Amino acid sequence: MVRAIVGANWGDEGKGKITDMFASQADMVIRFQGGANAGHTIINDYGKFALHLLPSGVCQPGTVNIIGNGVALDIEKLVKEIEHVTSAGVPQPNILVSERAQIMMPYHVMLDTYEEERLKDKKFGSTKSGIAPFYSDKYAKIGFQVCELFDEEYLREKLERVCEVKNLLLEHVYHKPTLDVDELFDHMMKLREMVRPYVADTGKIIRQAVKDGKNILLEGQLGSLKDPDFGIYPMVTSSSTLAGFGAVGAGIAPYEIKEIGTVTKAYSSAVGAGEFVSEIFGEEAEKMRNHGGDAGEYGATTGRPRRMGWFDCVATRYGCEAQGATQVALTALDCLSYLDEIKLCVGYEIDGEVTKDFPVTSRLKKAKPVYVTMPGFKCDIRGIREFDKLPKEAQDYVLFIEKEIGVPIKLVSNGPRREEIIVR
């Protein structure tokens, strides 16, 4: 059975913990899109890990961890992550890398950084991980697949063609030093040896696992509102964040995905620029940021403080619909225990009219939040394992969200560790 774990919002919803929990039951965990631009945090007996490329099943003995064809593969960062987890005592994980995955090139990161500098106050808030230039090259058909590392003659000829184009950009748009083909080729040869032990025809392996009835977990990155088609364009990422793309990024038929677990947080947070209707500011935001997560709300990749806001029912309902959610995991409920009252955004006022539909970006810019206020629960709820043992105010909060988003909330996370979860 194939299950996808994806985000309903801007990312940072707590998917890492939920994926880690399901990974303990999975034969195979697959990253199907994105790159090292966002991190999943998991906490277990080995320690705390912010994983950027490795699937969240790396700490599970016997689990096959696959980096699929849809991933932006930064080989150096992948190897560093493997070394990081094994140095913490995690047994050498079983990792496979798709031969069709495309490689993050050094100039992708450079161009990402230079473009943000050029845009100045109009920048996108990129993590400068090279994601947009990478996917631009992929769809312009000048990217490099892993399999091409093993054909030296073809690789050098292609590098010469691609560098000619990149050097025009570097010299005339960004006024930066140009690329040296020989240096880049030598670098690619080093990458080849680093990734060689992991390369496989993962699509074939995954399809066989589906036929054999294995438990397969598709691990998404970021969330619905960062999808390039259905997100808050242009403040989005460059690969689809939706469960539907999981089939493409792993190499299986779409009808094989039987469950879509969509993750949302009990409040809202976002990194980077873009519309955020329920955002809060100042001391109110700082308090929520410091109470959030397991060590405050700061980006796992950049360390930047996340923007904070109240739970947005409009955005989350839309995010769940875009994902095709069959069930929801609500995370970080315990982080709200300091509040006397909790607000939820239940509608948007746009040009004097209230709507519960999530609009396109041009209208979203005009939206003002419509709030309801609920009483807080003002007590430590960590350690509680049954829903009906939660304070009534906490139960009411969860049930209100469930009614608003229209998808059953099956999991409620009340702490950062894997075992701190309530199954309904």
Mark where each language-model region is.
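Non-transmembrane, aqueous-exposed alpha-helical and coiled segments at domain scale
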Residues: 1-424
